[in-house]
């Protein structure tokens, strides 16, 4: 009997040790679950270096604190909207932040931020201020401007993407960053401009100057570039795409006119013989930009001998961006083909 009692006590002790270990492991797992959901790690490169990737549950604060984004991370998000560091990337990717926009995709926000971080981790420069330090010292508002660079092939033309926002904020995460990323799939160099809503045209003029003057350094072609924009950004692209306006706003005659302007959902109606070849699209349910106004302007450009292409999509509202998952999906291919047809 004593031998059986001894075995029972030993077995009970082993069970208690096992239960304690399981409880400790469960506690450790629970304490790290929130962090693991917000950030995941992937291996990069032959040396098995790791990069922590953001997820939908990552916060704006975590993005801003990442060394990859140095002192310009706040420009990833609209500085003129109420975006707090506690907001998740899912929270910030809504029409509550990006007013007037539709078809916003939170997963695209995550992909964009991870793409830029990956480039920075690989030693690539992802942001270029367009103003000198002395200019920023004289006007602090110029600190909130610059070009995010998404990559591209050396020697190929560049495209500057200009988001809308009603000239009250810059909706880049939905209306220019996705475009700048998408264009790299075609080998072209994608830049997205962060501008001052109160001085948007001057900032785009400065951005064009910067890229043209630094083309060799940046390994991009200064010829055959294109200007893209949605809503307010489309007005910017059309205005600086006009040869006369380009010369006036830059004060220079040596910078070539854009080979193409790509416009989305805008009621911009001005036209002249100095306008660039233009591709445009819009939805029939756009309550801000009438498709008939856009069509009428392009018809007038055609009458002046300027090449155009126009698409209107049934049922789409304002600000559909790339149009992924909508009847507009694929328009980007058409716009690229149009741009390429205008290259000299």
Predicted regions span which residues?
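Short beta-strand/loop motif that positions the catalytic acidic residue
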Residues: 280-282, 286
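Short alpha-helix in the alpha/beta-hydrolase fold that links the catalytic acid
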Residues: 276, 290-300
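N-terminal targeting or regulatory segments adjacent to alpha/beta-hydrolase or S9 domains
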Residues: 21-144
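C-terminal catalytic histidine-bearing segment of alpha/beta-hydrolase fold enzymes
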Residues: 43-73, 304-344
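Short beta-strand element of the alpha/beta-hydrolase
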Residues: 156-165
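Primarily recognizes the serine-hydrolase "nucleophile elbow" in alpha/beta-hydrolase
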Residues: 206-275
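Short amphipathic alpha-helix adjacent to the substrate-entry channel of hydrolases
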Residues: 172-190
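The serine-hydrolase catalytic nucleophile loop
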Residues: 169-177, 195-196, 291-294
């Amino acid at each position: 009997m004593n031998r059986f009692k001894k075995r029972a006590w030993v077995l009970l002790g082993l069970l208690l040790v096992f239960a304690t270990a399981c409880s400790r492991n469960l506690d450790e797992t629970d304490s790290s679950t929130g962090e693991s959901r917000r950030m995941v790690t992937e291996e990069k490169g032959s040396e098995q270096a790791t990069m922590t990737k953001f997820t939908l549950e990552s916060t704006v604060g975590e993005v801003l604190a990442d060394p990859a984004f140095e002192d310009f991370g706040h420009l990833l998000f609209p500085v003129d909207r109420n975006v707090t560091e506690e907001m998740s990337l899912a929270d910030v990717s809504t029409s509550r932040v990006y007013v007037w926009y539709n078809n916003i995709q939170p997963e695209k926000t995550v992909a964009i931020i991870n793409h830029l971080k990956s480039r920075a981790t690989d030693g690539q420069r992802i942001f270029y201020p367009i103003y000198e330090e002395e200019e920023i010292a004289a006007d602090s508002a110029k600190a909130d401007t610059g070009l995010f660079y998404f990559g591209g092939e050396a020697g190929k033309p560049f495209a500057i993407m200009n988001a809308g926002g009603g000239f009250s904020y810059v909706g880049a995460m939905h209306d220019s960053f996705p475009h700048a990323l998408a264009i790299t799939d075609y080998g072209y160099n994608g830049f997205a401009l962060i501008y001052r809503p109160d001085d948007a045209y001057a900032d785009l003029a400065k951005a064009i100057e910067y890229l043209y003057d630094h083309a060799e350094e940046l390994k991009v072609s200064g010829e055959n570039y294109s200007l893209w924009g949605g809503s307010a950004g489309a007005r910017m692209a059309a205005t600086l795409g006009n040869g006369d306006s380009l010369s006036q706003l830059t004060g220079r005659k040596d910078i070539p006119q854009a080979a193409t302007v790509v416009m989305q959902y805008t009621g911009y109606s001005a036209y002249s013989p100095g306008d660039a070849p233009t591709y445009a699209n819009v939805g029939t349910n756009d309550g801000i930009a009438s498709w008939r106004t856009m069509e009428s302007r392009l018809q007038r450009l055609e009458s002046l001998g300027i090449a155009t292409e126009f698409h209107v999509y049934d049922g789409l509202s304002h600000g559909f961006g790339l149009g992924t998952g909508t009847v507009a999906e694929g328009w980007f291919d058409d716009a690229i083909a149009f741009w390429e047809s205008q290259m000299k």
